[in-house]
UniProtKB/Swiss-Prot annotation:
Record-linked Pfam families: ZGRF1-like_N (PF10382)
Biased composition (Polar residues): 301-326, 472-481
Gene Ontology cellular component terms for the protein in this record: cytoplasm; mitotic spindle pole body; nucleus; site of double-strand break
Name of the protein in its database record: Uncharacterized protein C553.01c
Protein's organism: Schizosaccharomyces pombe (strain 972 / ATCC 24843) (Fission yeast)
Annotated InterPro entries: DNA_Repair_Helicase_ZGRF1 (IPR052800), ZGRF1-like_N (IPR018838)
Classification lineage: Eukaryota, Fungi, Dikarya, Ascomycota, Taphrinomycotina
Biased composition, class Low complexity, residue ranges: 202-213, 601-614
BP GO terms, sorted: double-strand break repair; resolution of meiotic recombination intermediates
Domain of life: Eukaryota
Annotated segments matching region Disordered: 192-216, 300-348, 461-481, 580-630
Amino acid sequence: MDTSSNVFHYQVLWTSDKAKKVKVWKDGTMRFHSFNNRGILYDSDNRVVDDFFLNNKRIVLDSEIEFNRTIVYVENLQTTTEANIPPIPRKSKLSETGKRPAYLLKPFQPPFHSANSDVSNNSNGALSSNMLKTHAHHTNSTKSTIFRNANLQSYGVDDSDIGSLRCSSKHQLSVTPEIQPKAKFRPNSYLASSVEESNRANNTSPYPPSNSSVTALPKPSKIAYIPVLSKPKSFNGTLVEDPVEEFGEDDIASDFFSSPSADLEADDFTTLNNSNAGHLLQNLSNDNVSVSVKALENGNEEVSNNHARSPHSSRACNTIPSNKNDGLNDDHQRQDSSVAEPSPTSKRLRLTRLPLPLLRKPTGKRQNFINITVTDPSKNLYERSVKTAAELASLQNVTETTDNEIPNSPDFLDAASEEDEHIPSLDSSSLLTPLALPNKKAFQPVKFRVPSFSSPLVKPASSSSFGRSHSHLGTSLRSNELNGSSASSSIFLQSNNAVNPNVSPSTVLEHAKHPSLAKHSGVSLRTGLLIYPKYANGSKRKDGFGATSIISSGEHSSLPKNSKSRNVSVFSSPFNVPSFTVSSSDQVQKKKGNVPNAIETDSSPSDTISSSPTVRAVNLSPSKNQKPPKILTKIPDIFSKAGKKSPILPTFQESCSLPIEPFSSNITDLPFVNTVTLASTSSKIKRAKLKMLKFKHAMTTQGRDLDSDEDGDFI
């Protein structure tokens, strides 16, 4: 096998501007190794610039080869040399190349300790602090369990303290023994002899004697005592109930949350009694805890008093016997407690409870839990609700609230009860004057209709005068959805106060300035509405067709039939603006007479409106047998000149039969439940109807004939 191969040396130009159009070329050489088809680029100083594997490629002169980071232009071949091929490394030859380093051959080991180390004579000797456990002792848990006694002997803990260690690990928070750093480790022979001697001396050891060989003893390791919280026992062996499990509302006074453990902080029973300790000794002086009182009654009082008054009895572990010592009587318990009582001069470790953290007693939150009350008044919702229910039950006659904001009757429609009464109003004398239209044109009210999306507007079949008269009422409705029949009614039709007989008769319709307008205090600057007191007093009754009629209080009066007058039926509106039905064949007089804001006056200026009689009754839907009341007033001509009187044709009377009204404005018929919503809705209705009146006036002042043009209807 050849151990050398040819290497071709080429003179090249190279550049690192692979992406640029204008490239800067530099001189260099390229060596092509034929055994692995690798090209290496060198610069003019013989430094490696780039390399590339030219697999299945031939090097051609005057050609460009793209390397990894550069472009090489091959000019000519300079020379050919031979290079030795290095051997291919194999796994079998790894051991022949040399030894592996020590850190790869051996795992990590702790520092070595000589076997000739001195053994200390101190009985409390322990392992040095630099002695570490190996990995084998973590996995070998069974051996460490068997020889736990021997390990305890290696720490200098006698066999008499082993029971106290085991007892403290179950019932108390224990600490690990202090490790003295200068103590040395004892050899295995001394460990075996000490274990055998301790087993012979104390036959009360719960562990069986070790029959294994000395060499089977593992290296002792530091034992960690895990504290386990369990139920404490009283002095006669009965279990005290855990306050966490028996968490009642009546015996929370001895709650362990509210006070620290006074086990290590007080050496006298008097200090324990004074402190608010949630400990076992505190329960002796606490009357709320019944379990500790029963323990005192059943048990021996002498034993309890001895344990309570001895300063170190709370630290002795055997005062709380384990389950294995339950068969012992009280005498044995006293002996064990005296044996296990450590003397203050002894150098043995004193196994005590770890002190619990001092917890501040909560103030203001947990004062009295018996009454289920807290000092914070916002938390006593249950008590407040019970007290409120009791107060409400004691009240027999609960009076209705008479709040102006939440009315109890239809008086909320009174505009005087709203905020408009504090707003200065305009003078109402200008509102009662008739509207002066330009070019002497007649005031023609607009035909209004409620927009119906199901059927077009259809006028009711009636006489020509009836149809024309209803075109001046305000609207002509087609409401098959509401009544099932076509209906024509006034847009100003209102009977809000027909239900309330308690309305004071302060707003009876007057005739001094206008036959159907009541007294008002002016126009509201905020809403633009006329501010009225309460509506007219009336009662509600049914006609033959079931329609509603408003019969005002007072006598019914009418003029003689042969007097020169016209039938004008006045309909009540929310703001008392009248609309008229004039039955006459004279269309010119009709066009002049239908003014919504003022009634027609006589041609002579000397005649006043106040001379017309008072309107007493309005009947909307008369039956066939009952004729409508004839409301006859003098209607003077407004637009005729002062000196001339237009001829008045003899009038004839027609019975106006309206079907059942499609819309009702009664409070009981409105689709609202809340009276507060009704109060705000009524003002919105007033504003909407005022906008309709303004729209009528604006459209008629433009001089448009809106009788024929229905495109200008208000929607």
